[in-house]
Amino acid sequence: MAEYDLTTRIAHFLDRHLVFPLLEFLSVKEIYNEKELLQGKLDLLSDTNMVDFAMDVYKNLYSDDIPHALREKRTTVVAQLKQLQAETEPIVKMFEDPETTRQMQSTRDGRMLFDYLADKHGFRQEYLDTLYRYAKFQYECGNYSGAAEYLYFFRVLVPATDRNALSSLWGKLASEILMQNWDAAMEDLTRLKETIDNNSVSSPLQSLQQRTWLIHWSLFVFFNHPKGRDNIIDLFLYQPQYLNAIQTMCPHILRYLTTAVITNKDVRKRRQVLKDLVKVIQQESYTYKDPITEFVECLYVNFDFDGAQKKLRECESVLVNDFFLVACLEDFIENARLFIFETFCRIHQCISINMLADKLNMTPEEAERWIVNLIRNARLDAKIDSKLGHVVMGNNAVSPYQQVIEKTKSLSFRSQMLAMNIEKKLNQNSRSEAPNWATQDSGFY
C-alpha cells in the first residue's frame, strides 16, 4: 500500500546506510517498481565505499558491463584501506594489550586513560584523528563491527568537547543498529540523547533538528528491543522537547507512537496513556493522519464503532507494509479488538453476546470463548450471564486520591501542550530556513 508508505519521509532523517534495510523490505513487499528501488540503492551507494555492493546492484539493473569509474573507485578504496590499516596498526596493538583492556574497564576518566596510554605506549594526540578516520572509513565500506569497535576506543578517550565527539556517537549508534545489537544500540541511544539534551552550545534550532534525527533513528531500536515499546512512549509522549519535535518537524511519527501505545502489554498504563495520546492525535489531525491514528479517533473521540472496524481492516495493510511495524501486527489486531470491545461495553454496560459477535466479526461461540479468556487472564473486568447470553461490565470505583492524581496529570499535560503550541508557532517562521543537519561536515552523515 504505497499510499501510506512513509519510507521517503523517514529516509530524509536517516544516514544513507540505515536506508538500505528499508529498501530491501520494500523490494520484498513489491510495493514499488523493482528497477526504481535498484536505482535508488545505486544512488545511495554512490557516496559510500561499498563498491562491491554497488557493482552487484548495477549488474541487476543493467545488462552492460560494469562502468570503468566503478572499477577505478574499487582500486582507490582498496589502496586507501591498506594505507589506513598501516597507520592504525600500532594503535590497534595498544588496545589489544590485556593491561590496556583492564585500564579501559576500570577507568572512567578519558584523560587518565589517555595519560596511561601516552606513558606506557607512547600514544599521541594525532592518533585520535587517525582512529576516527579509520573507523569512519570502515563504516563507509560497510564493516560496521570494525567501525563500532574503533569508535568505542575513540569515545572513551576523547572529551565531550572534541570536534568529532558527537559525530562518533551517531556513528556508533548506526553501526550497532546495522549489526542488530539492540542492547548496545539502546545504550548508545541513551548516551546520544543525554549528549544532545545537555549540549549548551547548539542553538534551539540545531537542538530541534538533532532531536528529530534521534527520533527517527530510535525507531530501529524501540521496535526491536524488549523494552522498546515502553521507552518510546516515555520519550515521544512524555518528554516535552521530543513531543515538540514530533509536532513541529515530523507528525508522521504519531503512527509509531500510536502503535506502541496500542500494543503495550501493561493494561493500566495503556489506558492512561491512551487519554494523553488521543489529545495529541486530535491536535495534529490537520497535519497528519493515517488508518492507525484514525482508528483511535474513531473509537475514542467519535465513538464510531463501524468506522473503527473499517479503519482496523486498513490498519492491517499499513502494518504489514511498514518496516518497523510488521512484527507488531498480531499484538495490534488483538489489542485493537479488545479496545473496541471494552469501549462498546462501557457505553452499553450490558450487551448481548450475539451483538458483540457481530461487532467483532466472530461467531457467538467464538466471541464467548474470547471473552472468557479475557476475564480468565485478568485483562477484562466483566461477567458473563450464560442464561441470558449477556456480558456485564464491572464498575470499579476510583478512589479520590487516584482521581486527584489523574486530574493533576491532565493539567500538567495540558500546560505542556500549551507551551509547545506557542513554541511551535514561533518556530514555524524559521522552519523552512533550517539547514539540513545531514549536510553539515560532522562525520557520519
Curated annotation (Swiss-Prot):
Tissue expression per record: Ubiquitously expressed. Expressed at highest levels in appendix, lymph, pancreas, skeletal muscle, spleen and thymus.
GO MF entry, a single one: translation initiation factor activity
Phosphotyrosine: modified positions: 445
InterPro entries: eIF3e (IPR016650), eIF3e_N (IPR019010), PCI_dom (IPR000717), WH_DNA-bd_sf (IPR036390)
Keyword Flavoprotein: no
Modified-residue entries (Phosphothreonine), positions: 439
GO biological process: formation of cytoplasmic translation initiation complex; negative regulation of translational initiation; nuclear-transcribed mRNA catabolic process, nonsense-mediated decay; positive regulation of mRNA binding; positive regulation of translation; regulation of translational initiation; translational initiation
Record's function text: Component of the eukaryotic translation initiation factor 3 (eIF-3) complex, which is required for several steps in the initiation of protein synthesis. The eIF-3 complex associates with the 40S ribosome and facilitates the recruitment of eIF-1, eIF-1A, eIF-2:GTP:methionyl-tRNAi and eIF-5 to form the 43S pre-initiation complex (43S PIC). The eIF-3 complex stimulates mRNA recruitment to the 43S PIC and scanning of the mRNA for AUG recognition.
Subunit structure comment from the entry: Component of the eukaryotic translation initiation factor 3 (eIF-3) complex, which is composed of 13 subunits: EIF3A, EIF3B, EIF3C, EIF3D, EIF3E, EIF3F, EIF3G, EIF3H, EIF3I, EIF3J, EIF3K, EIF3L and EIF3M. The eIF-3 complex appears to include 3 stable modules: module A is composed of EIF3A, EIF3B, EIF3G and EIF3I; module B is composed of EIF3F, EIF3H, and EIF3M; and module C is composed of EIF3C, EIF3D, EIF3E, EIF3K and EIF3L. EIF3C of module C binds EIF3B of module A and EIF3H of module B, thereby linking the three modules. EIF3J is a labile subunit that binds to the eIF-3 complex via EIF3B.
Listed name of the protein: Eukaryotic translation initiation factor 3 subunit E
